[in-house]
């Protein structure tokens, strides 16, 4: 299997259709289909399950993907190292990011990074903690913004401690102004996110033996804030997201007792094996976090 074959299979697996892969690679869908069939013949087994809506990896192909992604990453790192020796910075950096980091950090980090290294193509993939962890393990992304609670099996560099807060409707009355104790949350209606999105919140509930009742299950932070503001319940969320995106959202902001925080950072499979582009991005993110 050649490097070009690996690139083709990775793109098809990522995009899910031959047509989308063809557009990305500037070739025809029939050329993609023919190339994939050729690789399948070489391997001796199918790599994709074909349906009317697209293609998905077979179980056998899923076993190959980590090695394929490792080959692509090694090739990319080699190209970047050669360029660096020649006094240039070029290549691609694939970055996984969760919602609040995408909203609050990337707009302040990426433009400066691109200005300093215009030859590096920064590719951003937004997803949940579980998505990013999976992408890192398969090599789909090289770096990922994560919290410490979701990066236990990865090489994680903490950058910023972000407090968790409780947001409440305007008419909610805590026992002590500005503060809500964990036991006060029992029996209250909650606006919640999916468990793979709010792992830090779920950890707080578990540590404080809280079994909350939720009627609203929300995907993104801004929708959660809107639901709380209109009286649908309380919510726990990172302070960073509220400060940056919802200062006038009409919610009360309450400090938690006991207090809790999440540690935001960058994760990868191995810090020592990062490409030159990834190492430079880590430096930029580290400096940005230090100045906050």
Task: Give the predicted meaning of each segment.
Residues 42-43, 64-86:
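Alpha-helical linker/hinge and terminal dimerization helices associated
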Residues 128-133, 137-140, 147, 196-252:
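Hydrophobic hinge/microswitch elements
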Residues 11-28:
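Short helix-boundary/capping micro-motifs
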Residues 153-190:
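Flexible hinge/capping segments at coil-to-helix
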Residues 174, 188-209, 274-278, 282, ...:
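Secondary-structure junction motif
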């Amino acid at each position: 299997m050649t490097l070009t074959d690996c690139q083709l299979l990775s793109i098809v697996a990522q995009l899910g259709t031959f047509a989308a892969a063809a557009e990305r690679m500037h070739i025809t869908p029939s050329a993609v289909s023919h190339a994939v069939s050729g690789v399948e013949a070489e391997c001796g087994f199918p790599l994709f399950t074909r349906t009317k809506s697209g293609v998905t990896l077979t179980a056998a192909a899923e076993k190959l993907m980590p090695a394929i992604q490792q080959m692509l990453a090694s090739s990319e790192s080699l190209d970047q190292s050669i360029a660096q020796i020649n006094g240039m910075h070029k290549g691609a950096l694939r970055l996984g990011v969760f919602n609040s980091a995408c909203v609050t950090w990337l707009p302040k980090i990426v433009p400066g990074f691109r200005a300093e290294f215009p030859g590096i193509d920064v590719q951003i993939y937004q997803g949940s903690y579980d998505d990013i962890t999976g992408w890192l393990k398969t090599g789909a992304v090289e770096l990922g913004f994560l919290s410490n609670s979701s990066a236990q099996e990865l090489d994680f560099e903490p950058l910023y401690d972000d407090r968790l807060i409780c947001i409440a409707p305007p008419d909610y009355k805590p026992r002590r102004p500005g503060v809500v104790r964990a036991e006060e949350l029992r029996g209250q209606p909650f606006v919640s996110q999916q468990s793979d999105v709010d792992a830090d919140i779920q950890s707080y509930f578990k540590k404080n033996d809280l079994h909350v009742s939720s009627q609203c299950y929300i995907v993104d932070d801004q929708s959660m804030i809107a639901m709380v503001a209109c009286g649908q319940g309380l919510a726990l969320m990172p302070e960073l997201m509220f400060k940056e995106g919802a200062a006038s959202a009409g919610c009360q902001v309450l400090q938690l007792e006991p207090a809790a925080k999440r540690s935001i950072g960058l994760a990868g499979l191995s810090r020592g094996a990062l490409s030159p582009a990834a190492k430079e991005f880590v430096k930029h993110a580290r400096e940005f976090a230090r100045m906050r």
